């Protein structure tokens, strides 16, 4: 069995809370020593667009989505986006 932990995020523009909490959980998994990736699918692929991610600010106790994403990536996390989902949305 793999030690990779995968968080799937399928919402961003319509429900920023889901994207925010997804990156909080993924970062916690990294902190526990798990190889961790985030898979962006359906509307979650909007998190891969910097301008869209910057609009997601859920407020305390959560940091803005862009900061959560940067922290996750800088800590060694990987982010993968669904190519067909991106294509459908013109990303």
What are these regions (language model features)?
Residues 19-34, 38:
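Histidine-anchored nucleotide/phosphate-binding helix
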